[in-house]
Amino acid sequence: MSLSMRDPVIPGTSMAYHPFLPHRAPDFAMSAVLGHQPPFFPALTLPPNGAAALSLPGALAKPIMDQLVGAAETGIPFSSLGPQAHLRPLKTMEPEEDVEDDPKVHLEAKELWDQFHKRGTEMVITKSGRRMFPPFKVRCSGLDKKAKYILLMDIIAADDCRYKFHNSRWMVAGKADPEMPKRMYIHPDSPATGEQWMSKVVTFHKLKLTNNISDKHGFTLAFPSDHATWQGNYSFGTQTILNSMHKYQPRFHIVRANDILKLPYSTFRTYLFPETEFIAVTAYQNDKITQLKIDNNPFAKGFRDTGNGRREKRKQLTLQSMRVFDERHKKETGTSDESSSEQAAFNCFAQASSPAVSTVGTSNLKDLCPSEAESDAEAESKEEHGPEACDTAKISTTTAEEPGRDKGSPATRAQLFPAEPSRARDTARLDKASPDSRHSPATISSSTRVPGADEHRSPGREGPVSAKVDEARALPAKDAFAPLSVQTDATAHLTQGPLPGLGFAPGLAGQQFFNGHPLFLHPGQFAMGGAFSSMAAGMGPLLATVSGASTGVSGLDSTAMASAAAAQGLSGASAATLPFHLQQHVLASQGLAMSPFGSLFPYPYTYMAAAAAASSAAASSSVHRHPFLNLNSMRPRLRYSPYSIPVPVPDSSSLLATALPSMASAAGPLDGKSAVLAASPASVAVDSGSELNSRSSTLSSGSVSLSPKLCSEKEAATSELQSIQRLVSGLEAKPDRSCSGSP
């Protein structure tokens, strides 16, 4: 029974083993079938006798019926064809032979390519890979909107020559080197429909050029021997390997295919643009090409003089400051003595927790500039000190509120005196003060400019006492380059509360040490008149004792107003009897600056020592315990910033207590009053101007808030100071602040 039932069954007609033969073979091209297969070719792994049947380039266009019939004729069992023989009909794929397109390609930025081509385009190649500029960008049209395309780019040798750049032109230097491994770059958006490709500019900006022959990026496909474009293995990746000093031609390819693995069996449409030809170099040979790249490439930071990073900005700031510094030096040595309109925008700010935050400006610019070797980590550490000081106090900064005011130039000097031999000798001695000026604290730096002639301020803003601000900047031209720098081992930090006081006579305000870096001191502690002995104690053996009978601040004034030979012999009373504006001009001519608010030493070394000796009885022991700050901890303050950072303003009563007795006994009424003004907790703002040419060192980017009440006895001299008042820029009067610091 069972045998009779099985006899009618034809062998091979069972559903499990019967091969599926479609009714209309042209509906199922091999390309359509492969498009829905995994990204490999398991169906093409045929035995040797049947390999030719399905491995031909045209196999993808053959109907599957023909392939199956051919396989049967060669004796291949259908089971060896694998799952290819059992595919169900696929209705979603359109036969490729029905797609008609006429692609057209247009090169983008053709004018820029032409400019480079006229001069001989060069492309830099590096071991890690360098992108092309101009980037290779094209716009496609004429593609079938529904069909999928793969867009590729490769770079081939334009000829078989090696080149060299000689006499400003490229010339043949011999036969080409052996060809590098072939490499093709596939656009990362591939495959995509024609509609997608035509809707945008196709850019190959991520392609990199390298000379690293061991580059392992990418993958390899084997192209059949009868492929129209290539034969053999061809690698695909993001980097193309080139030979230096060889000429190359980029090519653009369009392939209608929906799978990258079908590239070896697809038709390539290739497009050449002669203007994209270039020579591969390891460094640019033609300066014109370099300039073209700088002018047109927004990312050519390596060539451009100005960069966006901190180091680039700092470097350019340094170079500009040095140029201005040199120009000023030339003017000072010549007939003109003005440096009015050219000031470096180098604000090394140094605000501290003090009653009078004061004096930041352009000192010796070469030493103030942070070195190029400083790391960015150090630059970041410089910024960390800012927020600590920001929260504790409010600084009145009318300098930022009055941008119209010219802060640019110092007052006109009455005359120039030649440098005395003793001054030159002192300068030589001071040059030895800082063997390591690079690490000396260079933050509080007053103006070292030579006075110009066009400085002005709005009249009536300040009392006549503020005219001494001029004296703070009246430094001789020949002395503007030799600052004294002092190096100590004290470790007091800027934001660790009130620091030990270091008082200065008012006549010693507004200046700096003259040898490299200015001294980093507590700014508010410079305002104590007559407390100069603390500097003598703090500097130790650095200051030599100078013989003389000068007493107190007025004695210091007299030393400045006399000639160098007889300066030490004048009494304080004789100096105090001179009118204020005469004192100013005489002091300016001698190179000693006077100011109602305190800062650093004036230039003449003998004056400093004399003042230190004269005021030795005025300072308490706590004033000079730690007069200097730690060099390394305050180094981050050397950084330029266009913003002013608020700092704490502590109570100044203790500082006043040490300074006022000596002021009352030793100083004249004028100096005593100005010392009280400086001791008041008037905030002197650091210049907040961010212009590179801001002339911020006139008042060392800070001015004192003066009170008309404190200047009442000077109202008689107002008419004599009208011309001087127009030469001084400062903050508006703040009576409440000035009165709070007065006893």
UniProtKB/Swiss-Prot annotation:
Q: Does the keyword Cytoplasm apply?
A: no
Residue(s) carrying Phosphoserine: 371, 434, 440, 458, 707, 738, 740, 742
* Residue stretches spanning the membrane: none
Name its cellular compartments.
Answer: Nucleus
**Skewed-composition ranges (Polar residues):** 440-449
Q: Which residues bind DNA?
A: 107-220, 241-305
A single Gene Ontology CC term: cilium
Q: Name one GO molecular function term.
A: DNA-binding transcription factor activity, RNA polymerase II-specific
The biological processes this protein is annotated with in GO are: animal organ morphogenesis; anterior/posterior axis specification, embryo; atrioventricular bundle cell differentiation; atrioventricular canal development; atrioventricular canal morphogenesis; blood vessel development; branching involved in mammary gland duct morphogenesis; cardiac epithelial to mesenchymal transition
**Which terms are listed as keywords in the entry?**
Developmental protein, DNA-binding, Nucleus, Phosphoprotein, Repressor, Transcription, Transcription regulation
Report the coiled-coil segments. none
Ranges of biased composition (kind: Basic and acidic residues): 379-388, 422-439
Instruction: List the residue ranges of the region (Disordered).
Output: 371-467
The job of this chain, per UniProt, is described as: Transcriptional repressor involved in developmental processes. Binds to the palindromic T site 5'-TTCACACCTAGGTGTGAA-3' DNA sequence, or a half-site, which are present in the regulatory region of several genes. Probably plays a role in limb pattern formation. Required for mammary placode induction, involved in maintenance of the mammary buds during development and branching morphogenesis in embryonic and adult glands; partially redundant with TBX2.
Known partners and oligomeric status: Interacts with PML.
In its UniProt entry, what is this protein called? T-box transcription factor TBX3
Native species of this protein? Answer: Rattus norvegicus
